[in-house]
Amino acid sequence: MKNPLLRPWLTEKSTKLTEQKGQYVFQVKIDADKFDIKKAVEEKFGVDVVSIRTINCLGKSKRQYTRKGLIAGKKSDWKKAIVTLGDGQTIDYYAKPAEKSEK
């Protein structure tokens, strides 16, 4: 699978996990498995991954009342991965990735 990581998930709870336990949270593709996520994090950030927990989040159902009646819809389902790193390792979300040298 080509890069299952979509974006870092930055919330108060995920920031607290990062500061206290060294765990980082990412939004990943819905069909990504733990092996793909581990490989992508290790390659992109150059760290050792100790463990990964994944959570399937269901999209919310939405309703809108209009003159023509009720319009029902649903937001997309998505997946979240909590990645635990080795001791003393960190990830800088805002650093630019290392540039690849051209051949």
UniProtKB/Swiss-Prot annotation:
Part of the 50S ribosomal subunit. Contacts protein L29, and trigger factor when it is bound to the ribosome. One of the early assembly proteins it binds 23S rRNA. One of the proteins that surrounds the polypeptide exit tunnel on the outside of the ribosome. Forms the main docking site for trigger factor binding to the ribosome. This is Large ribosomal subunit protein uL23. GO terms for biological process: translation. It holds the Pfam family Ribosomal_L23. Belongs to the universal ribosomal protein uL23 family. One of its GO terms (molecular function) is structural constituent of ribosome. It comes from Chlorobaculum tepidum (strain ATCC 49652 / DSM 12025 / NBRC 103806 / TLS) (Chlorobium tepidum). Keywords: Ribonucleoprotein, Ribosomal protein, RNA-binding, rRNA-binding. One of its GO terms (cellular component) is ribonucleoprotein complex. The gene is rplW. Gene3D superfamilies: 3.30.70.330.
